[in-house]
Amino acid sequence: YVDANMSQAILLSCLLFEKANALKSLADYDNTGILGIKRFRMRLRKEVFADERGAKFSYFALFERKRQTINGIMGKELFEILSNVSSISWYDEKIHAYYFDFWVNEATKQAFRSYFHTAIECFQVFRLLYELNNYAVTMEKQKEIFESRGVYTEGKFGIPGADNDIFHFLDFFLVKQMNRQGKQEDLLLRQFSDGEHQFIHMMAICLLLKDADSLLILDEPETHFNPSWRSRFVSILNETLKNACEGNEHNFKKDILITTHSPFIISDCKPENVIILRKDKEGQTLAKKASQESIMTYGASTSFIQAKIFGNKDAIGGKAYQEMKKMSEQTDMDKQQLLNDVSTLFGESLEKLMILGKINNRE
């Protein structure tokens, strides 16, 4: 399970390890325009915890306990590795924290690759570091969370803020193309829009798991996308995986499960691959393939899919349509004036043409 809190770690792993061809979808100006990572900082606090026997140990020892869970990545002391691959590192006595600064160039990437070998291995290290932030949760709170059966369990889980995190990324600067003339700027990742964050998150996950025997489950990936990205999402996803698997084509066929309400995404899927979920009169959820209902989704218009799958036949907003319909029913107004008012007030649509026709045919 990978959530939005790990977006920086996922993206960083991809930008450090993937070849330029695999990163084309991110670099494309029409997508995010991310050309690479410029620099970033990592901070690790030297906290002390108590184990179940009451003995004290630092999180250095915690890594030793979990060493086997990350396939031997931690073959060397982590802090020695980070010192070796960073541009500069130091220890802050006041807050008991280590800082590692990285000015990223090709040598930086080669250094990461020599220690961590693959993007997924590098990410596993970052993921484990993120886990340490949870150790601030008391045993009493852990027990309450584990035994909770309510719908507000997530709200019980308080994560420390940036100042108290054991592991934290700082000054995460990306190189972004700002216009079609090639202008570039260094931007913090937090300066990107919600849609860009979601796009980066989805594509980076797919790149990260491209060589893994995995089922990718994407829950409404288009939520914050603009219309252009929604209409091109499947094409972009397909192109991203194809480029990433170049020279290793047997990995290209990935099983991806997408939940969506977007007619654009459905229009790019064959009917035998589209499963429609509906509730019957008793409230039971029924599942049928679009092909079983003779709904040809592939290449279908969004209005057709809206009507056939989502039961929404409206092609324009409900408020505008009701106002348009109300105007067409006015009988005490000059016909030509009414035609002019409808033409001026409303944008172009099939509904508008039908209303104009209805008014024009009035006796």
Region spans (language model):
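Extended helical coiled-coil dimerization/tether regions that scaffold
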Residues: S7-I200, A204-L215, C245-N248, N360-N361
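Switch/communication elements of ASCE P-loop NTPase nucleotide-binding domains
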Residues: G161-A315
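C-terminal alpha-helical "lid" subdomain
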Residues: K308, N312-E363
